[in-house]
């Protein structure tokens, strides 16, 4: 069976990364593509399901996993830990399923060091003006918060060149088509096609 591909997807807040991933998943069968489910120490929010949205664990369990190097990457955010389990990812990839990991540039660097075969995609907004408009979309944040989020977005975007692919999300449908094209091209790589069609190739080359 052909090994699945791990896709690292990063973008500044407001670039439409999560919406693009969710739209892509709706067009792909579950046995072909899945989104990574992270471990976290934060409490479940209403409607969240263990194993579907996150794997919810306590701080001691999480630290034990860190100690045995169970995570491809992990980070602390506002007092809670978040991490990507190496075992979980590898088990899914071994079934031939592609896995999408929605993560920032720092997490992406950690994962590339441990899984250099992963493919990485960065998504940019079409302009700062449009990014500002999207960041203001909720209409609930102060100017100070907007300015902070914009500064964080610029810092995130400065790492775009570290990725394999670049998508500019000006038109959503076009960006989604670009994302699908990347996935299709990766599935046609020689390494995956040789695994997938091994029996056919053997028969074709037999005397």
Curated annotation (Swiss-Prot):
Outline the extent of the Guanylate kinase-like domain. Answer: 4-184
The entry's keywords: ATP-binding, Cytoplasm, Kinase, Nucleotide-binding, Transferase
Keyword Phosphoprotein (UniProt): no
What Pfam family does this protein match (any one)? Answer: Guanylate_kin
Q: What are the EC numbers?
A: 2.7.4.8
Indicate where this protein is primarily found. Answer: cytoplasm
Q: Where does ATP bind?
A: 11-18
This enzyme catalyses: GMP + ATP = GDP + ADP
GO cellular component, alphabetical, reads: cytosol
CDD domains assigned: GMPK (cd00071)
Cellular localization per UniProt: Cytoplasm
Family indicated by similarity: Belongs to the guanylate kinase family.
Q: Which PANTHER family match?
A: GUANYLATE KINASE, GUANYLATE KINASE-RELATED
Q: Which HAMAP family match?
A: Guanylate_kinase
In terms of NCBIfam families, this protein maps to: guanyl_kin
Kindly provide the name given to this protein in its UniProt entry: Guanylate kinase
Origin species, per record, is: Salmonella typhimurium (strain LT2 / SGSC1412 / ATCC 700720)
Q: Gene name? A: gmk
């Amino acid at each position: 069976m052909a090994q699945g591909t791990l896709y690292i997807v990063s973008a500044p807040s407001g670039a439409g990364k999560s919406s693009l991933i969710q739209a892509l998943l709706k067009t792909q069968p579950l046995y072909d593509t899945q989104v990574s489910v992270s471990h976290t120490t934060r409490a479940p929010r209403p409607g969240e399901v263990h194993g579907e949205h996150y794997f919810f664990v306590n701080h001691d369990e999480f630290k034990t996993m860190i100690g045995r190097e169970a995570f491809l990457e992990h980070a602390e955010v506002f007092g809670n830990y978040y991490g990507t389990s190496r075992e979980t990812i590898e088990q899914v990839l071994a079934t031939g399923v592609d896995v999408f990991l929605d993560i920032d540039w720092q997490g992406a660097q950690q994962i590339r060091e441990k899984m250099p075969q992963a493919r990485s995609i960065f998504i940019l907004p079409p302009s700062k003006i449009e990014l500002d408009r999207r960041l203001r979309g909720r209409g609930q944040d102060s100017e100070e918060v907007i300015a902070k989020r914009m500064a964080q977005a610029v810092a995130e975007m400065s790492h775009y060149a570290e990725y394999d692919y670049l998508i500019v999300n000006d038109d959503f449908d076009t960006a989604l088509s670009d994302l699908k094209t990347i996935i299709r091209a990766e599935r046609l790589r020689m390494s995956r096609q040789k695994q997938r069609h091994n029996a056919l190739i053997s028969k074709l080359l037999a005397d």
